[in-house]
Amino acid sequence: MGRLFVYDENMTDERAKITVAKMAAVSDIVASEKAFIQYSAAGQLTVLAGAVIAVGDAIFQTEETTLSAANLDGASSFAHGKDYYIYLCDNGKDSSNEVYLISENSTFPDGVEWDDTNTRKIGGFHYGFVRNVDEYGREVNTSGSVRGSGWESNVREDIAPNSVWTALHRPKCDPSGMAYLGNGLWADIYLASDDGANGLQSVYNATPITGTEGLIWLCNANFSNFGNCDNMG
């Protein structure tokens, strides 16, 4: 369906008509399914139809759309160990539908025409090693045997299916480098490492926090507002 509202002073375009149904649907993001972006095939995601999304002063209603590396804002392929962010973009033309871009940028996509006023981050995912499983989600080896010899190394590079998040289906914290385990639980994909800003992160190929950093690092990172570390017992 694309652009849900347009300006037409003669009201001949159906999209210019404000109806009770339209107004009832419009808020920040409205979707019948919170996970309105889903893994659908190797290297592909599907945006489900019917989500209503505001971008600046424009409002769009999604059609079922397949996203892939072709939607990247610069590169031609996904890179191993990277987090990607999915944007719905408005080019400002009433005759045009929404534009989907995938970017490593967490603010807005690359391109002189895009900024934080005409793009909306609606989801994201992590790209890396994914274990091959059968239709029931059980780990298999290259011969298809459940937990058969060598199953541990039977992996592929792909979008991690349970890392896909949306603005409505995500953890309360930054979802980068995380995966959904079910029952409302999200977890880091990688062992926690120092983000360089007195916090932790889940990123590929980083040195994990080992515990040998000691209490001093912990105090500086998390307890700077609670007095001297010597008083912590």
Protein language model annotation of sequence segments:
Residues 1-19:
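Short, intrinsically disordered N-terminal pre-domain segments
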Residues 15, 92-109:
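Short, surface-exposed terminal/edge motifs of secreted or surface/virion proteins that either
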Residues 16-83, 92:
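Glycine-rich, flexible loop motifs
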Residues 90-97, 191-197:
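Acidic glycine-/aspartate-rich tracts in secreted/extracellular proteins
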Residues 103-159:
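Polybasic, proline/glycine-rich intrinsically disordered low-complexity segments
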Residues 132, 136, 141-143, 164-233:
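Short aromatic-cysteine micro-motif
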